[in-house]
Amino acid sequence: MEEFDSEDFSTSEEDEDYVPSGGEYSEDDVNELVKEDEVDGEEQTQKTKGKKRKAQSIPARKRKQGLSLEEEEEDANEESGGSSSEEEDAAAEQEKGIGAEDARKKKEDELWASFLNDVGPKSKVPPSTQVKREEETEETGSSKLLVKAEELEKPKETEKVKITKVFDFAGEEVRVTKEVDATSKEAKSFFKQNEKEKPQTNVPAALPSLPAGSGLKRSSGMSNLLGKIGAKKQKMSTLEKSKLDWESFKEEEGIGEELAIHNRGKEGYIERKAFLDRVDHRQFEIERDLRLSKMKP
């Protein structure tokens, strides 16, 4: 069976390749074959011409199988016009959809705002007034803080009191006047001395009312009072007198501030001396601490 099938398959292929001899063709068959050959040649020539025209980019008529393609071009133009109109319609529909979405969002916002107005508590004071009040409170608080800081920075002005002291310098009476704070020790001591001297000055006025038999006692009492008054005068040394004269000269000439500024400078003798004193004192404290630390068990 297999040999038979293979033989049949070979015979079928031979049948396809089989070409009859010329004597077997009729005249009709020959004419049909000639026509088919002519049609095939025309189609090939038309294809080559179409390719050349496409390469030259000439918008001419395309022919295929001997027929013009104008109808196909018109159909393509109609299709392109239809596609453009479809695109325009789609864009218009999109715009309409966007507008509808915007309108829907606006409606939703309005509904939400009305819901909040109905449900939420109504604020009696508008936000602008609240902001203004907050700013005013902040300004008042800052101004109060500034005032308190200024009050702390400014020391309380103390009252000044003029004190007059009497000194004895080489048998001469020297009076010194100073301006001192009312709460200072000098002012308090000066007031105490004045209070003590007032009753002593009133004693001589009461002496004439004493009886005449006490004349010796009267003279002794007067001498004692005068001696006490004279003994109260403090003696002034030469250094104190020179210092007093220098202070009075500075006040008369008005050079006290200039001298103070000069002495505070880097080249001032007083400033240098004070610096050296501070250094010595600090060195002494360090050495003392070291000694104490070594002495401890």
Swiss-Prot record:
Region (Hydrophilic): 176-215
Keyword Phosphoprotein (UniProt): yes
Keywords: Centromere, Chromosome, Developmental protein, Isopeptide bond, Kinetochore, Methylation, Phosphoprotein, Ubl conjugation
Spans annotated as Disordered: 1-154, 190-221
Chain intervals with Basic and acidic residues compositional bias: 93-110, 190-199
Pfam families in alphabetical order: BCNT
Ranges of Acidic residues composition bias in the record: 1-18, 25-43, 69-78
Residues modified as N6-methyllysine: 217
Modified residues (Phosphoserine): 80, 83-84, 114, 214, 248
Cross-link (Glycyl lysine isopeptide (Lys-Gly) (interchain with G-Cter in SUMO2)): 148
Subcellular localization: Chromosome, Centromere, Kinetochore
Residue span, BCNT-C domain: 216-297
GO CC terms, sorted: kinetochore; Swr1 complex
Composition-biased stretches (Basic residues): 48-65
Function: May play a role during embryogenesis.
Protein name: Craniofacial development protein 1
Gene that produces this protein: CFDP1
